[in-house]
Amino acid sequence: MGAAAAEADRTLFVGNLETKVTEELLFELFHQAGPVIKVKIPKDKDGKPKQFAFVNFKHEVSVPYAMNLLNGIKLYGRPIKIQFRSGSSHAPQDVSLSYPQHHVGNSSPTSTSPSRYERTMDNMTSSAQIIQRSFSSPENFQRQAVMNSALRQMSYGGKFGSSPLDQSGFSPSVQSHSHSFNQSSSSQWRQGTPSSQRKVRMNSYPYLADRHYSREQRYTDHGSDHHYRGKRDDFFYEDRNHDDWSHDYDNRRDSSRDGKWRSSRH
């Protein structure tokens, strides 16, 4: 390494100087970073100082330290710009180290963020298509209407007895009308659906869910259950009375026939 190259490594270029800045001022300023050998402000042909200067340090380690410490400081309201002198070994090394780090730091988010955005948009598009397919079929709407009407009639009409107004606020006549309409629509739907879908619908019928209730849940509401059992017992009682009446009628008819035959014989 020659003397000129060693001197370039220990020298800084200071630009954007005010005309009032002197060599003594720069000497005192840069002496904070390390011992300074000399400071030189070049002059033009007219003898006026130029707007840049060269600061020569005694030690090479003071050069990067002075650049980090004093770069951008204002002298007479104007910030100074410190650079490595041309021919210095610090200048290409600093540029080669700082530029790839800056480039890599800025390129990595831009390279990953579009792919992440595209994956997010693809997931949103696929989910929207699935939702659209599930709700766009008219059979799903008709099936939902039939299931809702059957569930309402089984829960309020059959289990809790007949009432003038159920909890939904409709009268029995309106319910019967809606029930007939739902039966017609369900029969049309049953004709158009294959046997596999019909089995799925029979398995998902609402009244099958009542079989899974526990014994405690089944007997919690004593009033409604008692009323339901009373109506069921009345039906069996009427059925038994009807069977007894028919049996008595048959016996009387047979006895009358026997009497007629006996009267005709005698």
From Swiss-Prot:
<dbReference type="GO" id="GO:0016076">
    <property type="term" value="P:snRNA catabolic process"/>
</dbReference>
<keyword id="KW-0597">Phosphoprotein</keyword>
<keyword id="KW-0469">Meiosis</keyword>
<feature type="domain" description="RRM">
    <location>
        <begin position="10"/>
        <end position="87"/>
    </location>
</feature>
<feature type="modified residue" description="Phosphoserine">
    <location>
        <position position="136"/>
    </location>
</feature>
<feature type="compositionally biased region" description="Low complexity">
    <location>
        <begin position="173"/>
        <end position="188"/>
    </location>
</feature>
<comment type="function">
    <text>RNA-binding subunit of the trimeric nuclear exosome targeting (NEXT) complex, a complex that functions as an RNA exosome cofactor that directs a subset of non-coding short-lived RNAs for exosomal degradation. NEXT is involved in surveillance and turnover of aberrant transcripts and non-coding RNAs. Binds preferentially polyuridine sequences and associates with newly synthesized RNAs, including pre-mRNAs and short-lived exosome substrates such as promoter upstream transcripts (PROMPTs), enhancer RNAs (eRNAs), and 3'-extended products from small nuclear RNAs (snRNAs).</text>
</comment>
<dbReference type="GO" id="GO:0051321">
    <property type="term" value="P:meiotic cell cycle"/>
</dbReference>
<keyword id="KW-0539">Nucleus</keyword>
<dbReference type="Pfam" id="PF00076">
    <property type="entry name" value="RRM_1"/>
</dbReference>
<dbReference type="GO" id="GO:0003727">
    <property type="term" value="F:single-stranded RNA binding"/>
</dbReference>
<protein>
    <recommendedName>
        <fullName>RNA-binding protein 7</fullName>
    </recommendedName>
</protein>
<dbReference type="GO" id="GO:0097157">
    <property type="term" value="F:pre-mRNA intronic binding"/>
</dbReference>
<feature type="modified residue" description="Phosphoserine">
    <location>
        <position position="204"/>
    </location>
</feature>
<feature type="modified residue" description="N-acetylglycine">
    <location>
        <position position="2"/>
    </location>
</feature>
<comment type="subunit">
    <text>Component of the nuclear exosome targeting (NEXT) complex composed of MTREX, ZCCHC8, and RBM7 that directs a subset of non-coding short-lived RNAs for exosomal degradation. Interacts with ZCCHC8 and SF3B2/SAP145. Binds to MTREX through ZCCHC8. Interacts with YWHAE and YWHAZ; these interactions are stress-dependent and RBM7 phosphorylation dependent; release RNA from the NEXT complex and may affect RNA targeting to the nuclear RNA exosomome for degradation.</text>
</comment>
<dbReference type="GO" id="GO:0071889">
    <property type="term" value="F:14-3-3 protein binding"/>
</dbReference>
<keyword id="KW-0488">Methylation</keyword>
<feature type="compositionally biased region" description="Polar residues">
    <location>
        <begin position="90"/>
        <end position="115"/>
    </location>
</feature>
<dbReference type="InterPro" id="IPR000504">
    <property type="entry name" value="RRM_dom"/>
</dbReference>
<dbReference type="GO" id="GO:0005654">
    <property type="term" value="C:nucleoplasm"/>
</dbReference>
<feature type="compositionally biased region" description="Basic and acidic residues">
    <location>
        <begin position="209"/>
        <end position="266"/>
    </location>
</feature>
<keyword id="KW-0694">RNA-binding</keyword>
<feature type="modified residue" description="Phosphoserine">
    <location>
        <position position="137"/>
    </location>
</feature>
<feature type="modified residue" description="Omega-N-methylarginine">
    <location>
        <position position="152"/>
    </location>
</feature>
<dbReference type="GO" id="GO:0017069">
    <property type="term" value="F:snRNA binding"/>
</dbReference>
<feature type="region of interest" description="ZCCHC8 binding">
    <location>
        <begin position="25"/>
        <end position="35"/>
    </location>
</feature>
<dbReference type="GO" id="GO:0005634">
    <property type="term" value="C:nucleus"/>
</dbReference>
<dbReference type="InterPro" id="IPR012677">
    <property type="entry name" value="Nucleotide-bd_a/b_plait_sf"/>
</dbReference>
<dbReference type="InterPro" id="IPR034500">
    <property type="entry name" value="RBM7_RRM"/>
</dbReference>
<feature type="region of interest" description="Disordered">
    <location>
        <begin position="162"/>
        <end position="266"/>
    </location>
</feature>
<feature type="region of interest" description="Disordered">
    <location>
        <begin position="90"/>
        <end position="118"/>
    </location>
</feature>
<dbReference type="GO" id="GO:0003723">
    <property type="term" value="F:RNA binding"/>
</dbReference>
<dbReference type="InterPro" id="IPR035979">
    <property type="entry name" value="RBD_domain_sf"/>
</dbReference>
<dbReference type="InterPro" id="IPR052285">
    <property type="entry name" value="NEXT_complex_subunit"/>
</dbReference>
<feature type="region of interest" description="ZCCHC8 binding">
    <location>
        <begin position="59"/>
        <end position="76"/>
    </location>
</feature>
<keyword id="KW-0007">Acetylation</keyword>
<dbReference type="GO" id="GO:0000381">
    <property type="term" value="P:regulation of alternative mRNA splicing, via spliceosome"/>
</dbReference>
